């Protein structure tokens, strides 16, 4: 899999509190649910454009070139997209929206390059007292933007170097050549740091770091690249006040507008989330020598600024959920709206996400 992870001091603190409470008799833990979002938070990182079913992998071929073999990518760039929550408004800790800075990095530490799915220790240093990541030898700065068109040329020397070591056992190429029988699959860690422009560098609420893994396929001469993984595409989010009654589709936010969907404050809102047909692909795992076909499993993660969900995650076999704005962490009395986020993901790392503005009515 290629699931996104987060690196924050807050998560470390939460884990410590959980361990402490389990060791004490009668400890009453009041830790917030993972679904509650009241501060800056990365909810999803998507490799691929925001178009439905966009390609989520990088692919390259080794071809004869003027100076020998050359590594040629099938596309000149890959879009990287960040789905970030930063709640503001009446009753919130931050009243007005603040500009955010998005910084993308490639982890090039040896543990990440030669131990697939591992994050090198040098790529884990993001706390206020840690060295500037822009100067880290384990990190390569790629560019900025909530949507960033990453040139695949930025991957060429990294992928080429790893490929040479895997095939020959050394940078000089003097080792025994071990030609694979199928295209080579590499997992490259991509890291996003998002921070408030002009925010407090010592306040962890003003920044967040997320990690995802870019699967890169490389075909040697005579090999055929596999069909690329594509991102799933969320369908309508159906909602209604009755569990078994009629439900209508909530209108999602777009880059141009964020319509308000009226819901009753303090009432259960029953929800059904899912994806469009074709979102769950069939595939062969990269490490499967038996070439067994399997179908992706889609899971849905739910988030909101207030209240609580019945379930933090759902799937296509049990797509139902419900939310109430006033349970556990009620919306502030001054707040006239809440935000709901839905993130869909499959085990190979493809993702899609939507946000919905809810107008709280009495």
Label each PLM-derived region with a short phrase.
Residues 95-103, 296-301:
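Solvent-exposed loop segments of extracellular immunoglobulin-like
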Residues 22-55, 353-355:
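Bacterial Sec-dependent N-terminal signal peptides
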Residues 194-196, 342-346:
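Conserved structural position at the C-terminal beta-strand
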Residues 52-64, 109-162, 293-322:
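Low-complexity "stalk/linker" and mucin-like segments enriched in Ser/Thr/Pro/Ala/Gly
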Residues 182-192, 334-340:
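Exposed beta-strand face motif in extracellular beta-rich ectodomains
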Residues 3-17:
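Bacterial N-terminal signal peptides that target proteins for export
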Residues 58-91, 250-287:
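Contiguous beta-strand segments within globular domains
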Residues 186-193, 198-255, 351-362:
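Short beta-strand elements
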């Amino acid at each position: 899999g290629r699931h996104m992870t987060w690196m924050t001091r807050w998560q470390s603190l939460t884990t410590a509190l959980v361990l402490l409470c389990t060791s004490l008799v009668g400890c009453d833990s009041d830790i917030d649910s993972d679904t509650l979002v009241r501060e800056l938070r990365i909810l999803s990182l998507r490799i691929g454009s925001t178009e439905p079913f966009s390609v989520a992998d990088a692919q390259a071929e080794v071809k004869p070139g003027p100076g020998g073999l050359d590594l040629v990518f099938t596309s000149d760039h890959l879009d990287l997209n960040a789905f970030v929550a930063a709640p503001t408004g009446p009753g919130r800790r931050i009243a007005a929206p603040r500009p955010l800075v998005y910084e993308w990095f490639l982890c090039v530490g040896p543990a990440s390059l030669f131990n697939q799915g591992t994050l090198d220790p040098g790529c884990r240093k993001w706390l206020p007292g840690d060295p500037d990541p822009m100067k880290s030898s384990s990190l390569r700065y790629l560019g900025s933007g909530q949507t960033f068109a990453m040139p695949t040329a930025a991957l060429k020397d990294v992928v080429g170097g790893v490929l040479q070591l895997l095939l020959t056992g050394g940078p000089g190429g003097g080792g025994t050549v071990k030609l694979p029988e199928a295209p080579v699959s590499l997992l490259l860690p991509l890291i996003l740091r998002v921070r408030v422009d002009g925010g407090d560098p010592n306040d962890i609420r003003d920044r967040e770091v997320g990690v995802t893994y870019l699967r890169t396929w490389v075909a040697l001469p005579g090999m055929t690249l596999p069909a690329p993984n594509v991102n799933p595409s969320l369908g309508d989010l159906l909602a209604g006040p009755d569990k078994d009654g009629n439900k209508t589709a909530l209108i999602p936010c777009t880059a141009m507008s964020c319509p308000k969907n009226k819901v009753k404050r303090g009432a259960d809102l029953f929800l059904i989330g899912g994806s469009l047909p074709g979102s769950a692909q069939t595939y062969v795992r990269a490490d499967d020598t038996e070439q067994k076909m399997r179908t992706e499993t889609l899971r849905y993660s739910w988030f909101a600024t207030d209240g609580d969900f019945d379930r933090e995650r759902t799937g296509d076999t049990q797509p139902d959920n419900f939310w109430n704005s006033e349970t556990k962490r009620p919306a502030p009395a001054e707040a006239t709206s809440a935000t709901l986020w839905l993130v869909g993901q499959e085990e190979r790392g493809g993702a899609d996400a939507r946000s919905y503005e809810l107008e709280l009515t009495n």
